[in-house]
Regions:
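Hydrophobic, helix-rich cores of sensory/ligand-binding and other regulatory modules
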Residues: 1-130
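Basic, amphipathic alpha-helical hairpins
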Residues: 107-110, 130-139, 148-159
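Alpha-helix N-cap and coil->helix boundary residues
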Residues: 94-98, 139-143, 159
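Poly-acidic low-complexity segments
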Residues: 42, 159-160
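Gram-positive cell-envelope targeting signals
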Residues: 1-7, 147-150, 154
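Alpha-helix N-cap/N′ positions at the starts of helices
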Residues: 26-29, 142, 146
Length: 160
């Protein structure tokens, strides 16, 4: 394993190379808008935003030398952030994580850029539709939802 100093030097070198190659990351505000649309259940807007395939998006940081692995990592990041935004919007913790886990496991089986992009579209629309339906029901507040999560997680233990 590399020392902390060697890791820092390597990181500085990679930052230098990125600047030299004019590699830039995508702006933050469109990313916030994207996840907010999922949280709000805005299906039409998510379909618009996902119209450009994940594998064609500009400004994605380089996460792997292996192209498919690179996109799988970005997919996993999207799944994790979508889950968190959905939890903020009232989806139960167990449901949000379960969906995220499911799609991350599915992306492992993808064999092409197109497979990953197609699954990305399906996942984003799935989360968004679920949030739209959840907002329709809106039967309880977030604190009550947290209590329900706790009870569900503790069904096989004594609650006192």
């Amino acid at each position: 394993m590399k020392s902390k100093e060697n890791l820092q030097k390597e990181q500085l070198y990679r930052e230098f190379v990125q600047r030299e190659e004019n590699l830039i990351h995508a702006p933050y505000n469109p990313e916030l808008e994207f996840y907010s649309c999922i949280r709000e259940g805005n299906v039409e807007k998510i379909k618009q935003l996902c119209n450009e395939p994940l594998t064609d998006k500009k400004g994605l940081g380089k996460l792997s030398e292996n192209e498919l692995q690179h996109f799988r990592y970005h997919f996993a990041i999207t799944a994790a952030l979508a889950a968190r935004y959905c939890m903020e919007g009232g989806m139960s913790l167990s449901k949000a994580y379960s969906i995220s886990d499911f799609y991350i496991q599915k992306v492992d089986t993808c064999k092409s850029r197109q497979d990953i992009s197609d699954l990305h579209f399906l996942m984003c629309v799935d989360y968004t539709i679920r949030m739209k339906n959840l907002r329709k029901k809106k039967i309880c507040s977030q604190p009550v939802a947290k209590c329900i999560d706790y009870i569900c997680e503790s069904l096989h233990t004594r609650i006192t």
